[in-house]
Curated annotation (Swiss-Prot):
One of its GO terms (biological process) is L-leucine biosynthetic process. Belongs to the LeuD family. LeuD type 1 subfamily. This is 3-isopropylmalate dehydratase small subunit. Its EC number is 4.2.1.33. It catalyses: (2R,3S)-3-isopropylmalate = (2S)-2-isopropylmalate. The lineage of its organism: Bacteria, Pseudomonadati, Pseudomonadota, Gammaproteobacteria, Lysobacterales. Pfam families: Aconitase_C. Gene3D superfamilies: Aconitase, domain 4. GO terms for molecular function: 3-isopropylmalate dehydratase activity. One of its GO terms (cellular component) is 3-isopropylmalate dehydratase complex. Pathway: Amino-acid biosynthesis; L-leucine biosynthesis; L-leucine from 3-methyl-2-oxobutanoate: step 2/4. The keyword Amino-acid biosynthesis applies. The keyword Lyase applies.
Length: 215
């Protein structure tokens, strides 16, 4: 998992509340067991005018020119502004996979659905909760300034505007540690690889008959 320390990126404003996981990545794309290939179908039913199917060439599909991510000014955005209860609905880890593969490093909203919030941390996507008034200010700034960028400083737990205004955000210390060091569940386990190896050696020495078939 890529470490997240500090990120400055173009901001896209998704001014919708209660965006659910089926809107983030529709159900027909969940058949794959891989973690890749979901970015092109992020917000599929909003980005395109037809119905998407797995394996289709999206370059030939008609775009919904009224959807914010299709606006030229937001191409390459890596910070997403959203409204309350982002990521609600069914539990699917594909939702943060799709956001991450599209290019988003952080999503900023007044609130998130619990399961989506937890899944995001496990997949290197930083969900940031800010107050409604702070979100309103960010939406206003973003909509009024083309090429608007924000800096997300995870170490300092600050979102910094171009004019120098900063917003503090809270994050669990363990989750912060994992993101700063790029540690997913596998990475955390590998930190104890030496201890695991010592246990296996001791276990094999004490009960060798359990390992006969492995020799």
């Amino acid at each position: 998992m890529t470490p997240f320390t500090q990120h400055t990126g173009l901001v896209a404003p998704l001014d919708r509340a209660n965006v659910d996981t089926d809107q983030i990545i529709p159900k027909q794309f969940l058949k794959s067991i891989k973690r890749t290939g979901f970015g092109p179908n992020l917000f599929d039913e909003w980005r395109y005018l037809d119905i998407g199917e797995p394996g289709r060439d999206n370059s030939t599909r008609p775009l919904n020119q009224e959807f914010v991510l299709n606006f030229p000014r937001y191409q390459g955005a890596s910070v997403l502004l959203a409204r309350e209860n982002f990521g609600c609905g069914s539990s699917r880890e594909h939702a943060p996979w799709a956001l991450d593969e599209y290019g988003f490093r952080a999503v900023i909203a007044p609130s998130f659905a619990d399961i989506f919030y937890n899944n995001s941390f496990k997949n290197g996507l930083l969900p940031i909760v800010l107050a409604e008034a702070e979100m309103d200010a960010l939406f206003e700034q973003c909509l009024g300034n083309e090429g608007y960028q924000l800096t997300v400083d995870l170490a300092a737990q600050r979102v910094r505007r171009p004019d120098g205004v900063e917003y503090a955000f809270e994050i669990d210390a363990f989750r912060k540690h994992c993101l700063l060091n790029g540690l997913d569940d596998i990475g955390l386990t590998l930190q104890d690889a030496d201890a695991i190896g010592r246990f296996e050696q001791g276990h094999r020495a004490q009960q060798p008959w359990l390992f006969g078939a492995l020799q």
